Regions:
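Short glycine/threonine-rich loop-to-helix capping motif typified by GTGT followed
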Residues: 105-111, 142-154, 185-199
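Alpha-helix-loop-beta-strand connector modules within alpha/beta enzyme cores
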Residues: 116, 154-167
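Conserved, mostly hydrophobic/aromatic
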Residues: 52, 95, 135, 179, ...
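Active-site-proximal beta-alpha core segment in soluble small-molecule metabolic enzymes
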Residues: 1-132, 141
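Glycine-rich beta-strand-to-loop/alpha-helix junction loops that act as flexible
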Residues: 100, 133-143, 178-183
Length: 256
């Protein structure tokens, strides 16, 4: 499958249409707003599959309450009935559920998952062709040597919640799709830095100046305060000490 998410500008719509028109029938554009259906139908010949993205509600700490992407929980079933149900060129196959903070064992995540499952159940009763649930957001990756996350428990519990809800509503369980960006590639690479010089700036703080910049090579450290496993390559027999790592730029955020 080729799952096409996000807001779609003209070129994106044209590229999706070219895939489908050239025979890639398992290309599924995920509808992000009410106008995208018209844009896609103007470019795609014949019948094609679509999905709908749920506009999830964010954690209280976010600066906004509802995701900018997708269609609100309460509007999805009515949107399907008005614009999709009687359209013979459209086949709804997928509901897309994405949480910005990722999959975590928190009350917030389980609450949003339950709301998503309720939408799937309600939509499935109206739309027999719906058979896919795409769970985005992804698992966390190891960011310290003390990292402890029970992946198997989370997988089992998510599947269990979906199955219980579907069984109670007497609807078929969906095929599960996942989009785990960081989890998939987070440990596929690394960065090597050389310590050029150590500065003792006060009684408690030592700075190891490196031959690079965290702003350019590890931007998540300053942009979203992401932590990474940082280990010495050599001198493991030396006495350990607490240090701050400083990048080469003059920017005050260039440190770890």
């Amino acid at each position: 499958y080729v799952i096409c998410t996000g807001f779609k500008r003209d070129q994106y719509v044209e590229n999706i249409a070219r895939l489908i028109n050239n025979g890639q029938k398992n290309t599924i554009p995920i509808i992000d707003n009410y106008e995208e259906l018209d844009l896609l139908q103007a470019e795609i010949k014949g019948k094609f599959k679509i999905g709908i993205r749920i506009a999830a509600e964010e954690e209280p700490k976010f600066e906004f309450y509802t995701s900018r992407l997708g269609i609100g929980y309460k509007n999805i079933v009515s949107f399907y009935k008005k614009q999709i149900q009687d359209n013979k060129n459209l086949e709804l196959k997928m509901l897309h559920f994405f949480i910005n903070t990722g999959i975590n064992d928190t009350a917030y995540y389980w609450n949003e998952l339950v709301k998503c499952i309720k939408v799937y159940v309600a939509l499935k009763k109206e739309c027999p062709s719906l058979d896919g649930l795409n769970i985005g957001g992804g698992f966390p990756i190891k960011n310290s040597l003390a990292f402890d996350f029970d992946y198997q428990y989370m997988i089992d519990e998510i599947i269990n919640q979906i199955k219980i809800a579907c069984d109670e509503a007497e609807v078929d369980v969906p095929n599960i799709f996942t989009e785990f960006g960081s989890f998939t590639v987070g440990e596929s690479g690394g960065a090597i830095y050389q310590v050029l010089y150590q500065k003792q700036q006060n009684d408690r703080e030592k700075w190891n100046m490196i031959d690079s910049s965290f702003i350019t090579t590890l931007p998540d450290t300053w942009a979203i305060n992401k932590r990474f496993i940082m280990l010495a390559i050599n001198r493991w027999n030396d006495t350990y000490e607490r240090v701050l790592l400083g990048g080469m730029t003059c920017d005050s955020d260039d440190y770890y």
